[in-house]
Amino acid sequence: MNGLSVTELCCLFCCPPCPGRIAAKLAFLPPEPTYSLVPEPEPGPGGAGAAPSGNLRALAGTPGRWKLHLMERADFQYSQRELDTIEVFLTKSSRGNRISCMYVRCVPGARYTVFFSHGNAVDLGQMSSFYIGLGTRINCNIFSYDYSGYGVSSGKPSEKNLYADIDAAWQALRTRYGISPDSIVLYGQSIGTVPTVDLASRYECAAVVLHSPLTSGMRVAFPDTKKTYCFDAFPNIEKVSKITSPVLIIHGTEDEVIDFSHGLALYERCPKAVEPLWVEGAGHNDIELYSQYLERLRRFISQELPSQRA
């Protein structure tokens, strides 16, 4: 779409869409769940075990122990030994939804934990292999969560739920594992950059990585949009300037879903941006396949962050 017709302009300004409708049309494609959480027996009088696995809603937010069960669709690439490094639990958002969380201990004693907000058409089961591979290669542990309506998280996906979901996951990571903000690298991919930018604009952390980010929902739907309207959704462009932590922006020059111009615009608007990574020829879903992706992440986390703290 190269511009807005008179009819489209009339529709926008006479009957503007609400942000929730823009968000729903642009972003949310939750897959069929590729995993389940199985409660592990808790010691108790008479050897009482855990509640039935179907009782997830009632147990959301409790400190019970859970075991990850991956379905074949998750396409897990590692052995049982690696699977055993994955801890899963449930927490509850301020909007009342059960949020599924995952902590992957890739590197004992790792300096940083990457807090990963994933893309729009995957869940934790599908991402688990990637998290193990990423963490071991960049020497970090990985924490992630599923948005409302994804995986075993309850509720429906929405912009408001995105913000509540990441808040709940942030608090769970900090309280459950005692990890301080200066040891957390917030990482958002695609739609995951929306909650990541929102959280990073409100809390300081070690660093932020924005992978194939969008400036706003309207700018994705209508590329010639130059300003942020009150009915826009996902207004990253209005929040990124409030981030006080170092920000690495990664984008493919041939991104067919979120145009490369979005990454450029956010880079220009972000006062804390470091040297970006523009991956020549990469699209929306294949940046990780290029060697410079891991090289840039390693340099950012192992060299640039420690030097900034010195």
From Swiss-Prot:
Biological-process GO terms, alphabetical: regulation of postsynapse organization
Location of the protein in the cell: Cell membrane; Endosome membrane; Cell projection, Dendritic spine; Postsynaptic density membrane
One of the record's GO molecular function terms: palmitoyl-(protein) hydrolase activity
Predominant cellular place of this UniProt entry's protein: membrane
Domain of life according to the entry: Eukaryota
Free-text description of this protein's post-translational modifications in UniProt: Palmitoylated on cysteine residues located in a cysteine cluster at the N-terminus which promotes membrane localization. Palmitoylation is required for post-synaptic localization and for depalmitoylating activity towards DLG4/PSD95.
GO cellular component: dendritic spine; endosome membrane; plasma membrane; postsynaptic density membrane
UniProt keyword terms in alphabetical order: Cell membrane, Cell projection, Endosome, Hydrolase, Lipoprotein, Membrane, Palmitate, Phosphoprotein, Postsynaptic cell membrane, Synapse
Active site: 190, 255, 284
Membrane topology: Lipid-anchor
Annotated positions of the Phosphoserine modification: 307
PANTHER family: ALPHA/BETA HYDROLASE DOMAIN-CONTAINING PROTEIN, ALPHA_BETA HYDROLASE DOMAIN-CONTAINING PROTEIN 17A
Recorded family membership: Belongs to the AB hydrolase superfamily. ABHD17 family.
Name of the protein described by the UniProt record: Alpha/beta hydrolase domain-containing protein 17A
Natural source organism: Bos taurus
Underlying gene: ABHD17A
